[in-house]
Amino acid sequence: MGVTATFDKVADIIAETSEIDRETITPESHTIDDLGIDSLDFLDIVFAIDKEFGIKIPLEQWTQEVNEGKVSTEEYFVLKNLCAKIDELRAAKG
């Protein structure tokens, strides 16, 4: 599955979970800054992504890395980057 197909599924999940208009969700959207998704909704989204793709997003690790200043929030929370991470996790799973 390419990033486009991954993005389409993730965008659908976000739209369903947080009642955001699907048309407003783009690969450049930042889930928190642009879409205004709160942490509770984001947990629901991550859970749905895990289920959809059969992976486990290491959200605690990502949050810790952001909080420690190791990476910017864009690294994980801009959709095109999030989708790339999802594809990496799926590839690693085999």
UniProtKB/Swiss-Prot annotation:
Keywords of the record, alphabetical order, are: Cytoplasm, Fatty acid biosynthesis, Fatty acid metabolism, Lipid A biosynthesis, Lipid biosynthesis, Lipid metabolism, Phosphopantetheine, Phosphoprotein
**Which SUPFAM superfamilies did the record assign?**
ACP-like
Does the UniProt entry include the keyword Cell membrane? no
Q: Which InterPro entries match?
A: ACP, ACP-like_sf, PP-bd_ACP, Ppantetheine_attach_site
Residues modified as O-(pantetheine 4'-phosphoryl)serine: S39
Q: Which GO terms describe its cellular component?
A: cytosol; membrane
Q: Which GO terms describe its molecular function?
A: acyl binding; acyl carrier activity
UniProt entry tagged with the keyword Secreted: no
Q: What is the recorded post-translational modification?
A: 4'-phosphopantetheine is transferred from CoA to a specific serine of apo-ACP by AcpS. This modification is essential for activity because fatty acids are bound in thioester linkage to the sulfhydryl of the prosthetic group.
Q: List the disulfide bonds.
A: none
* Gene Ontology terms: biological process: Kdo2-lipid A biosynthetic process; lipid A biosynthetic process
Q: Which NCBIfam families match?
A: PRK06508.1
Name of the protein described by the UniProt record: Acyl carrier protein AcpXL
Taxonomic source organism = Agrobacterium fabrum (strain C58 / ATCC 33970) (Agrobacterium tumefaciens (strain C58))
